[in-house]
Amino acid sequence: MEAYELDKIKVLATSFRGAIEIAKDAGEFDNDFAFPRFPKGCCGDTSDLLAEYLAQHDIYTYYVCGQKGTQSHAWLVLVNTVTVTTDNSDADRKYKSLISVYSEDNDVMLLRKYYNLKDAIIIDITGDQFTNQKCFLYYNIPVYVGFLDDFHKLFRVDQCSIHEPARLWDARCKSLYRAITKYIK
């Protein structure tokens, strides 16, 4: 990945984060259940909204969700920096065999995808919600674009999926997206 590409992503992510803060201050989120407390508790929705904004600029991402204890956190990673493999282990073959016994369709396809994030470029605009928490390293970076750092290593990744624009566009998300993007400079 070229430095100028990372710079472009950082500029876009910073603009999007800034627009969220302006929209919040303007009262755009007063009737929403989560965004009045941005960035606290908004990482999942924010990641989806940012993924859509980046896709509008031909930057494609995976949505990543991780867990540390009872706390979850979501962020994005660039698609072209993630290695995806499938598992064909004995356990998967046995599970597939068991499913085929109970399935009318004996042609069962079971592939678990594994996402190697070791060299992934992370885009996270809500990490600073953990600023006051020692167990999260007092993480205070509002916009992070870079490789896996100590903070993101804290989370056991539970989910990694490609951003699908149509999957999040309920009325609430459409409203949030419009409210945010009208403040992008």
Positions of predicted regions on the chain:
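A structural boundary/capping signal
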Residues: M1-K185
